[in-house]
Each structure stands twice: as C-alpha cells, then as structure tokens.
C-alpha cells in the first residue's frame, strides 16, 4: 500500500487495541533483524534451570480409520491402526524445555499405578530428571485418552472422535503436599525461572502458589503461571500469565466488560501480573501489559490442524524469552512462533515444541518478510 508521498507501507505484526499498525519499509527491515535476534536467543538458551511445578498426566492416543457407522446407532466404528502415549500437562512443558536445551526440574505427583510408572518411564527415556516426581500410594494417575479417526481415503483429515478422562482431582493432603512444596522452595534460589502449570488436579493450591511466588520474588526469579480460571487468585504477583482466548472471553462476560482489553487491564491490576498472554490459536497471540496498549501478533499459518499443547508451548517459549531478557513484545513474537509449530502438529510428537521446529518457524517468518519486500 502506498500513501500520498509514495512511501510503501505494510500491515504486519499487528494491532494495538483495535488500531492496525502500518509498518514502513525501514521498520520492516528492523523487524526482520528482530526475528533473527530472537532466533539466535533460541540457539543460545542452554543450561538454564527451570522449575516446573504442577499437575502431570499421561496423554494416550488411539488412531484409526472411521469408515463406517455402527449399524444400531449413529456412532463411528474405529478400525484401530496405532496407539501412542506420552507425558502431558506440566510434563509437556518439561519435555519442550528439555528439547530447547534448558534444564527442567519437574515437581509433581503421580499415582502408584501402571500409568504412573509409564509416565515416569517416558520422561526418563527422554533424559528428563524425574527425581522430584512424587508417587502417591493409592492415588490414580491422570490419563487423557483421545480417540482420533479419519476416513481411509482422507488420512490427512484426522478428527478427535472422543476423549476419555481417568483422574483423581482431589487436592493432596497437607502431609503429601508439604514435602513437594518444601522441595520447590529449596530449589528456587538455584533456578532461573519458575513455571506453575495448574490443571486443577490437586497439586497446586492457594497456599502452595502463594509461597512459591513469594519465594521466587524474594530471589528475583520470574514466575510464569498457566492457571485454571477458578484459580486466578492463586496467581497474584506472577510475571507472566497465560490464558486461552475462550477463557478471556469468559472472563469478559463474568466481569461485564465491553471488550477484552478492558478485561485484561482489570485482571492485570487486580492480580498484580507483569503481563498477560492470550493464546488464540489461529487468531494469534495477544499481549496485555499494565496501563499499555495491547499487542497482537497474528498467526501466519494458512491452515491449523489442532490445538493440543498450545499453552505448554507458550510457557516453554516464554522461558526462552525471559532467559535472554527479551522485551515482552519480542516474547509475544516468540510465543506466537511456538504456537504456530504446535498448531501444525499431526501426531503426539508434533504436539511438543522442539528447538528445530521453533528455529525453522522463525527463519520462515523472517524469509517471508524479505520476500514481501521484493
């Protein structure tokens, strides 16, 4: 697009509030350099110690062909072709951090059942330290089983047909919670970042969250919090908080605001957050900061395949950003690139953020900008 003076402008990176930002050629070159700088940060993020505390679960996937309906009911009949499983939730974050070259220390509880053993073994097979996983006698390990089907003639159009959840979401008793919390608090001074991943399965409670955040602040260790909407008070004082867009819309309605920008400012001030990252999938990533305009980094994908692991990828990317002292705007760019990697995932391994996937995505984004200038 050309203005009256003949200078070319390009719509890129975003929006501030509802206003489209028009970036000139000179600014776009700066943005390309910025992408390259962010990409270099991904390469240099090694040996950073990250505490990941929260709920873990075993993600199980059953794949097959759904060519027919049952003769007595309108339900698909799945011809099973494959089964896969891997560690999910907070363990998903740890897996991504490990692949990115950081050093995750995972603090969580699992059951003393075969699923707990499988979850622990899957992490050990990846080289992730499991010494801080607590096996609780008589507790059931959370398992999410997703049944995914496609027509045999359309193998690339997979759809989730059903999800089965097996879980024990009762809060841990104090005598079981206390050793986990004490271990986390002891490790905070030796760590660079804390990630709290609350899936409402019993590990995180108000007292634990408050003590972890307070201890981290005292040690100048930033906290990233992925909260349940019912647990927002737990997250007070966090440096960065992650929401999904549907959660943000729910909060807007609950608080009776006209738009999500007003909602975000309310939440930021009420909970003393440093920043709020709203993950929108195909709608990109929106960054809200206290008393500042919002920034939207749009998703550049022409097609998205799934959304499993989006917030986990975002949390891992934020760790890279904080490790390298990037500005929050650059952090939003990195988070968006991480989400784009996962949005293209086609199977269990594709739902986990990897260094190769993230650097490739950043390279592609910078290349697309260069092409657009020709």
Describe the function of each predicted region:
Residues 36-46:
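A short acidic-Thr-Gly-centered motif at the start of a beta-strand
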Residues 25, 50, 58-195, 352-374:
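Conserved N-terminal subdomain of the carbohydrate kinase-like
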Residues 2, 6, 11-25:
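Short glycine- and acidic-rich boundary segments immediately preceding or forming the N-terminal edge
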Residues 53-54, 244:
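A secondary-structure boundary/capping signal
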Residues 26-38, 171, 190, 207-237, ...:
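Conserved phosphate-binding/catalytic region of the ribokinase-like
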Residues 55-56, 199:
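Active-site metal-binding loops of divalent metal-dependent hydrolases
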Residues 67-73, 77, 147-166, 172-181, ...:
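Conserved beta-alpha-beta core of the PfkB/ribokinase-like small-molecule kinase fold
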Residues 52, 106-108, 225, 278:
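Structural beta-sheet core signal
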């Amino acid at each position: 697009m050309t203005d009256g003076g003949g200078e070319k402008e390009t719509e890129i990176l975003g929006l501030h509030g509802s206003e489209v930002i028009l970036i000139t050629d000179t600014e776009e070159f700066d943005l390309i350099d910025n992408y390259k700088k962010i990409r270099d940060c991904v390469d240099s993020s090694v040996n950073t110690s990250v505490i990941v505390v929260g709920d873990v679960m075993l993600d199980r996937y059953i794949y097959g062909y759904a060519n027919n309906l049952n003769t007595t009911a309108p339900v698909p009949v799945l011809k099973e072709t494959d089964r896969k499983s891997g560690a999910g939730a907070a363990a998903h974050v740890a897996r991504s951090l490990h692949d990115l070259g950081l050093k995750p220390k995972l603090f969580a509880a699992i059951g003393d059942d075969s699923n707990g053993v499988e979850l622990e073994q899957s992490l050990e097979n990846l080289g992730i330290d499991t010494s801080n996983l607590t096996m609780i006698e008589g507790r059931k390990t959370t398992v999410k089983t997703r049944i995914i089907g496609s027509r045999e003639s359309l193998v690339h159009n997979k759809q989730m047909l059903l999800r089965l959840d097996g879980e024990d979401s009762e809060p841990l008793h104090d005598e079981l919670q206390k050793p986990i919390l004490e271990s986390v608090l002891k490790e905070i001074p030796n760590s660079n970042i804390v990630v709290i991943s609350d899936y409402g399965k019993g590990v995180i409670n108000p007292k634990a969250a408050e003590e972890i955040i307070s201890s981290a602040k005292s040690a100048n260790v930033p906290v990233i919090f992925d909260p349940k909407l019912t647990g927002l008070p737990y997250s007070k004082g966090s440096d960065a908080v992650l929401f999904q867009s549907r959660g943000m819309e729910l909060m807007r309605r609950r608080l009776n605001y006209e738009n999500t920008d007003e909602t975000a400012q309310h939440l930021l001030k009420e909970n003393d957050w440093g920043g709020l990252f709203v993950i929108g999938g195909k709608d990109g990533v929106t960054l809200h900061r206290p008393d500042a305009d919002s920034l939207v980094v749009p998703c550049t994908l022409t097609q998205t395949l799934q959304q499993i692991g989006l917030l986990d990828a975002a949390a891992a990317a934020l760790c890279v950003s904080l490790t390298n002292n990037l500005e929050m705007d650059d952090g939003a760019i990195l988070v968006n690139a991480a989400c784009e990697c996962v949005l293209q995932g086609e199977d269990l391994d594709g739902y986990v953020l990897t260094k190769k996937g993230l650097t490739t995505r950043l390279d592609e984004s910078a290349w697309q900008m260069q092409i657009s200038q020709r």
